[in-house]
Each structure stands twice: as structure tokens, then as C-alpha cells.
């Protein structure tokens, strides 16, 4: 994370189930006069349904658009396509990768922080998931991938809100929040949203996300924002659910977070899609950590649980360290760095969020707490 990112091109990974509205959003990116030059990478040009009227020039896999953006296809090697874009004259304001045919966004995201050459020139900016508000309950019953896409996302666009009632939308919002407690959520119809609100946000970079929102990991920040085409009244204030009911002000750090499935079963009837969710979030909060215990622990747990960990992110306070340590990971890949000095009066505590499947909360919590500096070694 300590690498300079000033000259790097931000990369947005766009995911979402068939019919969620990705094509509509991509056509907007490739046609609107937004003054930016984006490169859009799709799996198959014909499949994604880009409007042919937008094309002014085509050169093998690269398609020039009327507004200066380009669209290119990837057949196999994503890295080769990205490197080809980097060699083109001029500079792109951003790269958007659409995951058609690649239901799992994780391998695409990993490309941008595993390959040294690509990483030197680009930076993963955000993973954006589009959700079909009308059909999400059915999608969750049919597809594990639909749930993974939400769980892995930094930003979720709940689209087609004009096709559901306010009550149905409230349930969809609860489901999305239960799957991914830290994602920023926007409600839209016809994928209508100011592109500046979802592109070049630095959402995947935990350091920048924390700079933009110091309470990013607190799970209670209000972030339901309507797109310009969303006409719903969202004054329901999370529908009466207290998403901060996890009571993170305990000082014994031994509280049971098993209710991080958010207890929504009590809020909706037996048909609620919440019952179909298999992804859970595990939130840990402790005191100052001993680095000699913490680093071997995080390495061990990610090696053991890696396939089940979709995302992990956190802020760690190390005893005797005057700077906050920010850590994030995907599956078995974890990276971290110091972010900034602790402020006067700021509570020096450690917070860590795991999002994944079949995670043993009690085991993770117990071993995490054993990394605290004041805990005696047995």
C-alpha cells in the first residue's frame, strides 16, 4: 500500500447477475459527454450489447467510441489486454472491467494487485455490483455467485427500484446490508447514477476509504443514496433496524458477535430471502495488539480459511506504535501498511471485519483476542 498511486490509472470491476443493468450502465459510460476517457473491457463485445451506433473506429479488439472512450474485448488473457491499453497513446481516466462470463469477480480483482507490471501502472479502485431489486430473492435461491458478487463489492447499485414497492425495496436493502455490511449502497432505476459517485472513488483502497469516511468499518454509517432516476422516498431510516445494535462499546471485548447475521429473521416473514444467505460477516473489536502475535495469526488464519474469506479489512492498533495499521485481503492474499498517526484522544483499538462463508466465529474471535498485547501467553 505504500507505493505511490498518484500516476496510477484507477480500475473498476463491474459485476452483477444477468439482467441487473450492467449493459445499460456501460452504454452510458461509453456515450455520455462526461469529459472523461474511459477504457471498458468486456468479455465478448457482441454479448454485452454495446450500441453499434456509438462506434467510430474499430481496430481488432479495440473499439473507439464517439465520446473518446474505448471498448475492448478480452479473450483469455486479461493482463495482455490491460498492457495493450497502457501502450496506447494518451492517458485513460480509468479502466472498467465487466465480468460477463466471469461470474466470480475475485480472479479479476486479484489480477490488479498480483501482477507486478499491471500493478505498477494501475490501481484497483472499486468493485461495483449491480443488483436487480425485482429478482434478487430468486437470484439468491438459484445462485451462489449472486451472493458472492454482493459480498465482494465495495459499492452496490440496487437497480430497477421502479419495479418494486417501498416495502419490497426495504427487504432488498436489508438483504444487501446483511450480506455486506461495509458496502456503499445506491438505489437506482435504469442504472441512473452520476458516474462521479461510483468511479474513481478509491473504495477498494482501505486507506482512502477511511480518509473519506472515518467510520467506514463501523457498520452504522448512513449510505443509502438515490440515483437521479430513483423516485422512492427513503425516509424509512433503515426501516427501523438499528444496524449499530452490535454494541461495539463493550470494554471486555468478549461479547458474542454471532448476531452478525443481523437478526433479520425477526423482521421479515418466512419467505424473506434473508434465509437464503450463506455469506456472513464477522466483526471483531479488541485492544492494542502484539505484532509478534498478530502477524503470524493473520497469516495462519488466511492460509487455513482463505477459500472461505471473500474480503477482510481492518484497522489495527499495535502497542507502542504511534501509527494506525490498515490491513485488507482477498482469500489468502493479505496486505497492510501504516496509514496515519493516531490522533490525540483517539481510542487506540483494533477492528477487523471478515466477510465469507463457514467462518468459525468463536475460533476466530478467541484467537484474535489472544493477539492483544495485554493478554498473557499461556
Question: Predicted segment positions?
Answer:
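C-terminal accessory "lid"/substrate-recognition subdomains
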Residues: 2-3, 164-343, 347, 357-378
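Nucleotide-state-sensitive switch-loop elements of NTP-binding domains
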Residues: 2-140
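Flexible, charged surface loops at secondary-structure boundaries
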Residues: 33, 90, 150-151, 319, ...
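Phosphate/Mg2+-binding loops and adjacent switch elements
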Residues: 88-197, 202, 206, 210-213
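Flexible loop/N-cap segments at domain edges
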Residues: 354
Amino acid at each position: 500500500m505504500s507505493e505511490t498511486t498518484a500516476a496510477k490509472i484507477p480500475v473498476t470491476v463491474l459485476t452483477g447477475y444477468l439482467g441487473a443493468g450492467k449493459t445499460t450502465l456501460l452504454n452510458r459510460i461509453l456515450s455520455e459527454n462526461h469529459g472523461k476517457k474511459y477504457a471498458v473491457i468486456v468479455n465478448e463485445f457482441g454479448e454485452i450489447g454495446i450500441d453499434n451506433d456509438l462506434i467510430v473506429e474499430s481496430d481488432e479488439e479495440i473499439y473507439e467510441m464517439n465520446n473518446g472512450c474505448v471498448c475492448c474485448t478480452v479473450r483469455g488473457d486479461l493482463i495482455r489486454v490491460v498492457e495493450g491499453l497502457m501502450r496506447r497513446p494518451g492517458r485513460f481516466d480509468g479502466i472498467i472491467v465487466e465480468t460477463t462470463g466471469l461470474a466470480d469477480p475475485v480472479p479479476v480483482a486479484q489480477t490488479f494487485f498480483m501482477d507486478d507490471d499491471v500493478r505498477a501502472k494501475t490501481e484497483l479502485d472499486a468493485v461495483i455490483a449491480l443488483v436487480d431489486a425485482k429478482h434478487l430473492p430468486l437470484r439468491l435461491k438459484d445462485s451462489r455467485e449472486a451472493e458472492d458478487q454482493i459480498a465482494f463489492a465495495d459499492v452496490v447499485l440496487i437497480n430497477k427500484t421502479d419495479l418494486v414497492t417501498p416495502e419490497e425495496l426495504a427487504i432488498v436493502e436489508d438483504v444487501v446490508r446483511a450480506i455486506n455490511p461495509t458496502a456503499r449502497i445506491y438505489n437506482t432505476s435504469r442504472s441512473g447514477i452520476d458516474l462521479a459517485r461510483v468511479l474513481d472513488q478509491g473504495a477498494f483502497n482501505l486507506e482512502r476509504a477511511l480518509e473519506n469516511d472515518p467510520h467506514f468499518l463501523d457498520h452504522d454509517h448512513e449510505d443509502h443514496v438515490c440515483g437521479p432516476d430513483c423516485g422512492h422516498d427513503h425516509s424509512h431510516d433503515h426501516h427501523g433496524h438499528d444496524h449499530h445494535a452490535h454494541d461495539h462499546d463493550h470494554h471486555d471485548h468478549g461479547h458474542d458477535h454471532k448476531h452478525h447475521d443481523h437478526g433479520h429473521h425477526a423482521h421479515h416473514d418466512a419467505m424473506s430471502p434473508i434465509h437464503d444467505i450463506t455469506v456472513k460477516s464477522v466483526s471483531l473489536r479488541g485492544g492494542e495488539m502484539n505484532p509478534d502475535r498478530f502477524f503470524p495469526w493473520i497469516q495462519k488464519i488466511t492460509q487455513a480459511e482463505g477459500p472461505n474469506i471473500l474480503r477482510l479489512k481492518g484497522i489495527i492498533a499495535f502497542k507502542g506504535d504511534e501509527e494506525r495499521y490498515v490491513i485488507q485481503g482477498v482469500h489468502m492474499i493479505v496486505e497492510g501498511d501504516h496509514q496515519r498517526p493516531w490522533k490525540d484522544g483517539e481510542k487506540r483499538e483494533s477492528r477487523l471485519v471478515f466477510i465469507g462463508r463457514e467462518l468459525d466465529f468463536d475460533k476466530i474471535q478467541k484467537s484474535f483476542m489472544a493477539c492483544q498485547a495485554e493478554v498473557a501467553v499461556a
